[in-house]
């Protein structure tokens, strides 16, 4: 029987352990075998190889099937295979066809082992598609504030740096109520609060944007920011009474009633003072506070003159102080030709507001018939004349005196600042007054037309509180909501009748409108319940439509160095710290310790430039920032090479303790800075050897006034 030779050892290793252990490979044939014997053996092995191949195929199919006994007993999933996280030392040659066909599938990289870019870029540890070495986690811009770039050193980074790509810095990226970055989760720092100015906003946009598009985006951002802020303020304070008294339709009904009663009382007192000749025309609310109580005396002169007011048209020192402190009206109001227009316009406003508040018998209102009669009697008069009949005298008001009286009446009775274009329910502070003398203004005509159009719209409009109360809208909504509560009943004697559908009410009426009236008067709880949704919507709309609503004035971000990071020369303390910690950070990254260096950088970014006399730079601004102490190493800092007094930028240098170097840079009022001789400034800040003598000549220094302040070249003389 012919000898059977097994295949080579590499194919045996790829078999199952059972097959490999059942037989051992025979020794190789001796080298003295003849070629004829080898050919005979090959011919004899051909059928055996075919049989072995077919048997191996059956065995491989059996291997793919799970073991019946083991899997039936244990249904738990197989444990995860052990993964070798070590990098392969070298690439092995490709295995033969049989090995590739039956080799196990490639395993995925272990999770959370290494971050890889999936946006058609390269890993940060390799060449970045933009050139240089890019950080591994920088898909949406800088994700750490301050410090140095995370790979291969680099220039110092700043926490306020942002990418300026095409899709970065849009107003949608900032959340309402905050003006921070769009990707705040990666920054690790609090977002800066406040509305960005236009200059700050355009720094967030791409560089190739048009000015008109930038302006449009800023207006959208500003309106969205204010709307979001007002909405949050409203949701916080909407249940408070003071806000409801200003905007809620239900509360406004009682507010309007109290306001009308108070205005009637103040108008009565004002006219009495005018007839007695003791009216004060000052810009303050001196006659009555809007609370309805007389003002308390603030000095001995006022206490002595309680009940005796200043005569009409006469002023004192205190009135002059108030006039100087009051805000000034536009310059066109001082034109003498403007007096007649203002008198007629203020009289029309007095008639309009008095009718809204139901004030009657006001001598200042005048009328068209009286105006024509006065023009006939006083042909030489330049305007309307108001006759004031007192107890013992009769006086006529015209011109500037009449205008001041009308303006004061509008302010104290109706809370209307004529020159300030403001109408409020409570007059507080000082009203606008005319400036002395005419001041030339290039935009006087435009401002004058806007001024007149503003008050003409008020004359044609309605009471602002009545508009916010929206009685007509609420009545229409109530009528629609009360339709199911109006019942139509057939009566054999009287025909059709209409009954009340409220709970427990059995009254009948001849028409449906009487049922609606009955429900609104007798069943107010039902009407209020049905119109609650409409009232709440009006409440919110009234608040949002008021441009001067509380909580609607956004706080702008601090300008100046906070707008843009200042790349100033780093302090000596930071330079020492970077030397001590930079090598350790690079070594940690080389070992794969790339997870905690970001948090250290964030801490350092808030403390760059730790000089107490220096204005620190906070990347995000705002109050309540977290200040973390700078990194301190346990290794003693090496001595610094500092130039001797009088030396140039190339030396000579002497070693100095770091404390002395930092003290010299930290104290600007101390000895002279480096590269300048001490001259008359006193002794040098170093303990020098007698071999180094000071040059008596003072080194001239020059300052380039045109050089940009942000591009400061840092010269490190330690490398020389």
Curated annotation (Swiss-Prot):
**Biased composition range(s): Gly residues:** 608-622
* Entries under Pfam families matching the protein: ARS2, SERRATE_Ars2_N
Compositional bias (Low complexity) at which positions?
Answer: 33-47
Q: Where is the composition biased (Basic residues)?
A: 99-115
Could you tell me where this protein is found in the cell? Nucleus; Nucleus speckle
The UniProt subunit note reads as follows:
Interacts with HYL1. Interacts with RCF3, RS40 and RS41.
Q: How is this protein named in the record?
A: Serrate RNA effector molecule
